[in-house]
Amino acid sequence: AVFHLMTHAFFKALLFLGAGSVIMGMHHDQDMRNMGGLWKYMPITWLTSLIGSLALIGTPFFSGFYSKDSIIEAVAESHIYGSGFAHFAVMAGVFITAFYSFRMYFLVFHGKERFGQPHDDHGHGHDDHDAHDDHHGLAPGQKPHESPWVVTLPLVMLAIPSVIVGYFAIEPMLFGEFFNGAIFVNLEQHHAMKELAEAFHGPVAMALHSLHSPVLYLALGGVVTAAVFYLWLPQIPAFFARVLAPVKNVLDNKYYLDDFNQAVFAKGARVLGAGLWKGADQGLIDGLVVNGSAKLVGWFSGSVRKVQSGYLYHYAFAMILGLIGLITWILYTHLGSIK
């Protein structure tokens, strides 16, 4: 698994960067149904994407083959509980991976040119991001272009290890001392690894042996099926799209996960934020603590200010009342002390 993680990093990064190069060449259009025939306009991206796809599906002598086939063989030789279902799952994954990888490859780089036309509504999500993306793409009559060297150079640099790194790394990483005890595998308890080590006779022999393996034919079947569906007989997937329209609608809307996230998380966050803003910030903090104390001082000052009328007889009257009150207090306290 660690070996496959390493090889997978190269060709999956290559495919992601290739996708970014295509998006740049298409002026940010990300819908494969608006592409086709890009190989003649983006030759470096086309070739490196082909290399990445071949490595991803486990083509013999490519890096993905050595790590992927090792996992498949290890699962086939395993006798632990559930290994039979695991083997079925990985074999099905071989076909599915080859199918969807070359579906992308054929739709983007081969077939009829579908760019430079007004975009139809393909039923994608209806959030703001998708609405914004609808304004991108090639104008009518405009052609795609290859990406600049700052993009194509990394594509080439990633394509090289996608081809050769598995060939040179399989023996030291799986059967040698590459990890030097950092990863310990008890071969007595893991018979699959022990049998793989005994059957390994070099990377060339391993690749040649796979030429009559069902894994290779499943991968080829996926590639051929993708070619039939999306190059030679596109009416077949169109027929299934009509027959399975409800399923297609769910898939086009990405299982409605974007709508769910928008309605629950995004809208919920906005409602919560508005409540905290109006209730806690404006109501409690600003309204009661900050502005409330200021209003209290203002109210008290306004009340006291009413005493300051500006009329002299009011002040004289207040002084007389004060003097009467002072005399009363003195007499009260003095008489009380005499008693």
Region roles according to the model:
Residues 8, 35, 64, 105, ...:
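Divalent metal-coordination and catalytic microenvironments
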Residues 115, 124-137, 141-223:
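Hard-cation-handling environments
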Residues 1-2, 76-87, 335-339:
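Helix-coil boundary and interhelical linker segments in multi-pass alpha-helical membrane proteins
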Residues 26-62, 85-93, 119, 123-164, ...:
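Interfacial and helix-entry/exit segments of alpha-helical transmembrane bundles
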Residues 12, 16, 87-142, 218-241:
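Predominantly late transmembrane helices and immediately cytosolic-facing juxtamembrane segments
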Residues 1-80:
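Hydrophobic, small-residue-rich alpha-helical packing segments that form membrane-like cores
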Residues 54-70, 158-177, 271:
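Alpha-helical transmembrane segments and their membrane-interface junctions
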